[in-house]
Regions:
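Glycine-centered secondary-structure boundary/capping sites
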Residues: 20, 164-165
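Active-site region of PLP-dependent enzymes
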Residues: 46-52, 59-162, 168
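Active-site phosphate-binding strand-loop segment of PLP-dependent enzymes
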Residues: 1-75, 80-88
Length: 168
């Protein structure tokens, strides 16, 4: 199906890993190599899934993770990209574009955007990733704020101190 959809305008193949399952990345990468295409994985619904001993999001040129409220790792907004060392993409350029085009402090080499996640949201994502990777998240069935588990996820971090404020 993928090869039949490739045209002269095609620049990338974007497989979407769903329900903790990883697409057949060896086959997809082989097709991409044959046609000189980039592979960009959408890994939002398969955080922590593996194939051939490698994590989803690290099986191609670029892995993307959404942290939107319905995703496995949830910070209400934002996301993350991963660029493996063997990627054909320019990781320093991508990093600069996500950081307002800066290649170093006050040096803007590219037209860029502010795609930086706020530090408290990074902490939330990091906390959930740690729980998820150690199996605690799946055992507890943590999913989101409706479960009332964010205080546990956030306050379990040494960098965060809970204020002793009551509702009085």
């Amino acid at each position: 199906l993928i090869e039949a959809a490739i045209s002269p305008k095609t620049k990338a193949i974007m497989p979407v890993h769903l329900f903790g399952q990883v697409c057949e990345m060896d086959k997809i990468n082989k097709i991409a190599k044959k046609h000189n295409l980039v592979v960009i994985e959408d890994t939002s619904q398969s955080f922590g899934a593996e194939q051939n001993g490698k994590l989803a999001g690290m099986l191609s040129d670029l892995g993307t993770f959404s942290f939107q409220k319905t995703k496995n790792i949830n910070t209400f907004e934002g996301g993350m990209i991963c660029i493996p060392k063997n990627s054909k993409l320019d990781a320093p350029k991508i990093r600069a574009i996500c950081n307002q085009g800066q290649t170093s402090k006050y040096h803007h080499e590219y037209l860029g955007f502010n795609f930086r996640l706020a530090e408290p949201l990074c902490l939330m994502a990091y906390s959930q990733m740690k729980l998820h990777m150690t199996g605690i998240k799946s055992e507890l069935g943590l999913r989101g704020p409706k479960d009332g588990h964010y205080p546990y996820v956030v306050y379990d971090q040494p960098a965060i101190k809970k204020l002793g404020i009551t509702g009085d």
